[in-house]
Amino acid sequence: MQNSNVELMVYGDDVADDTVSIAKGDVIIKHSQALDSENYLFITLDTSKASAQELVIKLTDNDGSIRDFSYVLKEREQGSASRVGFGPADAIYLIAPDRFANGNKENDNVEGYGDPANRSFKGGRHGGDIQGIVDNLDYIRDMGFTQIWTMPMLENAMDKYSYHGYSTTDYYKIDPRFGSNDEFIALSAKAKSKGVGIIMDMVLNHIGSNHLWMKDTPSHDWINNNGKFVGTTHKREALHDPHAINSDIKGFSDGWFVPTMPDLNQRNPHLANYLIQNAIWWVESAGLSGIRVDTYSYPDKAFLSQWTNRIMDEYPNFNIVGEEWSVNPAITAYWQADSHRHDDYDSALPSVMDFPLQTAVVKALSSDESWNSGFISVYETLATDFLYGDPNNLVIFPDNHDMSRIFTQLGHNKDKWNMAMTLLLTTRGIPQVFYGTEILMSNEGSDDHGIIRSDFPGGWPSDSDKNAFTGHGLTDDERWAQQRIKALLQLRQSHPSQFKGLLKHYAPENGVYTYIRETDKNEVGTAAEANTTQSDKIMVILNKKAVKLSLSKYAEVLSNNQTLTRLSDGKSFKASETLNLPAMSASVFIVQ
């Protein structure tokens, strides 16, 4: 490892004053430190010369009594440091594991855990689990997804609403109602064997109020606001505002989301190190291809720099995406590595969620075309890409688990849905699709998160009427939508260099928005990408009104001897022809 020091947090009755010793000589105890609680001891080990082994660490109290515990140093997987994270050629499938598929009914309820399974309650646990994902990996792969991001599956031993996973009560333990650590590791391995990576959702900002740290806090400054609820202002702009006062910055960063989510103080170096080591441990143990960080900007700003740099030092080709829910590109861009920013902040975060583009797409398809409305919102948003260090590495999406589903946002209009999905699966960035979006799942009449995260049909043995995994019982529209997503995803797989490459777009005109994706000749990295298809282009035309469109207007990117083959029906056109496009069309062409 680049950093060979390991800090252990030891918890036990009155361990704070114990003396630490190890029999083996190749692991060195650098120091130990107690904080406020008499039940915690922090031990720093130097493992730079150590081999894989099981350590026996002895704790001797003032009376000479000895207790010991084992700590295992494991061998790293070969090539672990050079692992390649998810990237622009990928497509991410976002899953709420409790709502996707129930592969093991035996773990629906587990002794010692409250919040029992109740599928009839929208805010309750429904029984989905790791085995349900494993059982349906072929569906995910065959659709064309190459990465899976699940909402957090670490232990959430909360009294209610534990299904969503964002109230961690143990950072090193998969919630047994989802499965076990071994099952999660096996999921990652099996997915990898099918060409699918696993992105782990991590929460650095807060914990669940039933965490041990709230019953026995290691130090007085472990939790912000002295361990008492003070709500965050959510005024993220204060972190970037050159005119901001410190109290506004503190009000944003140190405030809690809700009383059941205590806000962590990452300025405490032991807590910071705990969170850093935990992330690295999961990358190593589970063979992750990426991390998604919840509420990215809310933790301490200096800590975020430390956290991202430490992880990227260990895995230079890895990818981490941060959730910064702002519709202002200047705010989201600030966090991405190599972006233009007004200060010397050192961000090593490779990717951010592109909320500005998501908002622009919905706005474009929900408004009439004019000089300042319609597709111009997408065009203007993409025109600000100069703010980002790497716009191709942004994660783009039509919706997610925290907002209304895109079909609902667009008024349950399948043509608008098609235009949105076509755009977001073909423009620059890494597309993420929320489970069920491919079959027009909606939340009509309610914006409740429990409704938005409804069960995927076919994931439960009792789902006899409809099964989206097999297609049984789907309506014609649902089946069409599923096949449309599949076709677009498979296009991405067959043309990776184009979707990792350049975006060139024309300013919208008369309700028509056109762009191409083409290979960046300077970035062709593999033999597979360096074949003849790198000369192909992908052209996308979105139009709201029926139009006769002469392809000659695109002479800058097309030549007369080229042929355009339409993805939807395989029909071919010469670049000199005129297209007759019906209203509300989303046309994708392979240009050869």
Feature-to-residue mapping (PLM):
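Extracellular Ig-like/FN3 beta-sandwich strand-entry sites
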Residues: N5, A50-E54
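Short, hydrophobic beta-strand segments
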Residues: F42-A50
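Carbohydrate-interacting/catalytic domains
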Residues: Q53-L59, D63-A91, V134, D138-R141, ...
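Hydrophobic faces of well-ordered beta-strands that scaffold small-molecule active sites
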Residues: A91-Y93, I148-T150, I198-M200, I291, ...
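Active-site-proximal helices and loops of the catalytic beta/alpha 8
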Residues: H206, H211-M214, I280, E284-S289, ...
